[in-house]
Amino acid sequence: MALTAAYGGAKWSERSTVFRDDLPGTWGDWGVSSECGTLRAVLLRRPGEELDGVIDFDAAQMRADVLPEVARQQHDALAEAYRAHGVSVSYVERTRADKPNTLFIRDLMLMTPEGAIVTRPASTVRAGEERFVAEALACLGVPILMTVHGGGTFEGADVCWVDQDL
């Protein structure tokens, strides 16, 4: 009996493209390979109620005390500046009340030319924040290439794109 197409038979059609070639038609225009190129889209977390209950900013591993209302005003001004320059602004809407650092999105993901790497912060204070970034990326349709797992730790702010071919 001849194989059906589903099992490699005569009507089987093998992909001849690489993932990067599939991006525009399948996933959309996602990907970053530069720290200084034109910014088209950004993922942010507006400082929320998770900042209101912080009493000890050092224990929260923040470098200085934060005034939540001032942080919100500054965030809103930044988001508006992005929009005024044609940048699409998306948000991580959810987090937990005990995760005030979630607003530092750059730590929680790294965009590559082919999609996102969801990181795994080294600090127990930050543990679990990456889930909310992964949810937001999935809702936006951004391909998630990898999630740092096992005993690995990594933060997106630890990387700087120098050359897309490196």
Predicted regions, residues:
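The feature marks the mature, well-folded catalytic cores of soluble enzymes
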Residues: M1-L166
